[in-house]
Amino acid sequence: MAKSHEIELSPVVDSSAILAILFKEPGATRAMELIGNGLCSMVNLTEIMTRCVDRRLSPEFADDVIKAYSIAFADHDEDLARIAAGLRSATRHKGLSLGDRACLALAIRENATVITTDRAWADLDVGCKIEVIR
């Protein structure tokens, strides 16, 4: 009898998980365990860089963490734009931003689990698995 093997897909990484590692916030340890070889939206990279600038750091401050965890970045193309726009009505009541919806759209398209620290996502039913790490 053949043994079934579950294939582990790379997670989609929300900016909040990377920021938790960068700024030693709650959830950082769990993020370090989960985000390796993950995929992140370019929209979320903008959020990460912006948060660095807000803290008077260079936008490149996150580069070492991104490289250490082999995070790849996906362009926010027309396909993702349409998915993210379609998520608006299902996420508006939670106050999700464009960046949040871009992340979820990527996870939906890639059939992947999202890693986030955002508790507001915990009970969303949008077509992808969501793991809240804080």
Protein language model annotation of sequence segments:
Residues 2-3, 74-113:
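Active-site neighborhoods of divalent-metal-dependent phosphate/nucleic-acid chemistry enzymes
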Residues 1-40, 52-64, 134:
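Short, well-structured N-terminal submotif of metal-dependent ribonuclease cores
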Residues 55-60, 71, 76-81:
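Ligand-binding grooves and catalytic loops that recognize ribose/phosphate and carbohydrate rings
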Residues 68-69, 82, 100, 122-124:
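Short secondary-structure capping/turn micro-motifs that flank functional sites
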Residues 17-18, 44, 80, 102-103, ...:
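Alpha-helix capping/helix-boundary segments
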Residues 8-9, 35-38, 70-72, 108-113:
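Short active-site oxyanion
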Residues 1-8, 104, 108-134:
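Acidic, PIN/NYN-like endoribonuclease modules and their adjacent C-terminal/linker elements
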Residues 49-50, 66, 85-88:
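Amphipathic alpha-helical segments within well-ordered protein domains
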